[in-house]
Every structure is written in C-alpha cells, then in structure tokens.
C-alpha cells in the first residue's frame, strides 16, 4: 500500500509515535577526549503483539500495580520537561510510552562498567528500583495494554520493536535472546562505519512501514554517523473510535482564543449527551472513552482533556500536574453529568523533536528523535488511556448542568485505564495551525 500524502485527511484519527535517540553517558567536564555517541534509541510504534516469553523468574516477585503507578507520575514528569524544552506555548504531542520502552531496552542490554552506569541513570530517571521492575512494566504493557482489539470491535493497536547493531561489535547471545523473545524485537547487524546513511534510510523506512506511512523521515540527516554503535526502535500505532460518536451536523465553527489576545475560527464538536466531567479548583477534566470491544482484557481506553478555567493558566496547571504525586488517578471523572455548553475542537497535529536538552539536568545525555501524529474528529482518535480507580472529586451528582468549552489552550492525554499507561500526551494552543 502506498503511503498516504501528508495532507490527506485520515478516515478517523491515526496516531503513530516513533522516536529515535542517541544515548551515551555524559563524561565529566575535566575529560577532554571526544566521546562517541554510541547508542541510539528509536521509538516509533506499531507492532504485532504476541505473548512474551519471560526469561527472568524474578519478574513474578515485582508488585506490578505499584510499579505502574510510579510510571503515571513519570509520564507527567516527562511531559513537563519535554514541553518546557521544545514546545513552550505551541501545539505538541509525543508518546511517553515509546520513550519508556526504548529506555527499558537500553537498560536491559547495557553491559560493562559504562553500561552499568548508564543503566543506573535510566533506573533513576524512570523511578524504577531495578531492570526487573522495568521489564515487568514492559511485559504488563505489552500483554495487556497493547493487544490488538480490532477484530472484536475494539481499538486497532500494533507495536513493534527493533535493534540495529554495528557488525563490528560482539553479540551477547543472552542479549539477542532477550530482544527476540522478551521484547519481541527485530534484531539486525549492520554497517554503521561505512554505510551510516544507508542504515538511517533503512530505519526511516522501518518507521514508515510500521506506522501506515504516516511517519516519514524520523531520523534527520546527520543523526546516524560512523560513530554510531546501536539503534533501538519501538513503534506504536493506535486507532480508536469514540464510545459515543459526535454528529457532524452539530459541528460548527467557533472562535478559539489564543494567548496573544487574538482568536481563530475552528470547527468544534458538540453534544447534548451527558459527559464524564469533573470540576476542580482552577480547572476541569473531561474524559472521553473509546469503544472497548468484546475481549477478555478488561482494558479501557480514553482521552482526557485538562482545561484551565482561565485562558492564560495552562503553565500553572502543568506545574501542578507535574508536582503532585498521583495527580492523574486523583483527578479522574467517574460519573457522567448533564452538560450546558459543551464544545471541543477538532484538531490534527504532527510534532517531531530532538530533545537532548530536556535530559541535560540528569547527567544522562539522551537525544530523542520522536515524531507523533494525532487527529481528533467526530469518529474518534488515536491513543491509549487508563481509568483511575478513585477521584478527588467527592461531590454529589450535579443538579445544575456543567459547561465544558475548550476554546482556549489545554492539555490532553490518552491512557489505558486499567494500568494507567499514558500512551500519548500533548497540548493545543492553536487547533488551526
């Protein structure tokens, strides 16, 4: 199938989230020798999901529920540092799950003294106690969250992982087995030393083919060189339909107010049906469930929109989210309420970035190349979500209808609600851009 043109409208929303990064330890400033940027992490995301072979008996001793809760906070933490470094006051979307998966593969395969130090930094960065804990999280996400449900009426989900290693490096049979059987990853030995550009093209083709042609040129020219040792890849694709679709006849153009005091006219979806909305001090949260299908995974997917009450307070809301442990689980609408004015904008954004500066404060020089595409329309969107078990909103059922008009900048997440996995996170400053 030929890749779709970039301007072609998707029949529903389609999200692909690749990312690629060079990773190496940051050396002390006193050392003047040039350090090779030896590892690269690519994180697109689309794949066939098969049962994972678990090689480590110790994984069974991990409290996966507690480990997953920590990853919810890590996802918001990642969102905050990436937005502050590369997407201040602009449309933005990325995949925390892709970054987590790529770093997990790096941590699991890093050997030697330098590898041990790298692994230690990654564990600290992801707030995990061990590589076993990271692997247990990976297993839970792969076996529960990312199972394709399209044949039973649920979301279309696919995930694929890959690793490219220079042919001059020795291959540890255990590491190779780990990638193939645990991470279900493709493994290839390539020639970075004399054919770096060809390998870059190969990785970009891999990312494109596993995201239905939606993600092109993941790795920019010059990102892979003769000094590259490894490239890790993790691709994710999600396509879901709203539990309750919106009527196109009710979609009307209305003003969306920008931070500079002007406005743009964009199409807003609307509905008179009850919605999952909760009001908090200074902001509201809307939960939009996806159709779940008839499988036995007990998964639930949803998009969350976090809307500040005032137009210029999105940064304050993000700061509150990133500094409050358990924020997502404690700010989760649990009941449908009657709505007064209800409007959310249609939007389609594509965002690519290289975010080495985002990690500079953590003594871990990780340069991520990630591209993500998301579209929201009357039929649905692409993303994964987790439904929290409790809500801080303890009021009785609302008597008066509640308004939810997303006509100014807001944050959004897509989560799987059983595990809390944040697949996609972003912000909208101008739906017309």
UniProtKB/Swiss-Prot annotation:
Free-text comment about domains: The reactive center loop (RCL) extends out from the body of the protein and directs binding to the target protease. The protease cleaves the serpin at the reactive site within the RCL, establishing a covalent linkage between the carboxyl group of the serpin reactive site and the serine hydroxyl of the protease. The resulting inactive serpin-protease complex is highly stable.
Protein family membership: Belongs to the serpin family.
Location of the region described as Disordered in the Swiss-Prot/TrEMBL record: 1-43
GO cellular component: extracellular space
Matches recorded under Pfam families: Serpin
Region (RCL): 380-404
Leader sequence residues: none
GO MF term list: serine-type endopeptidase inhibitor activity
Basic and acidic residues bias (residue ranges): 1-12
InterPro entries: Serpin_CS, Serpin_dom, Serpin_fam, Serpin_sf, Serpin_sf_1, Serpin_sf_2
Biased amino acid composition, Basic residues: 23-36
Tissue spec. comment: Weakly expressed during seedling development.
Identification of the protein by name: Probable non-inhibitory serpin-Z5
Site (Reactive bond): 394-395
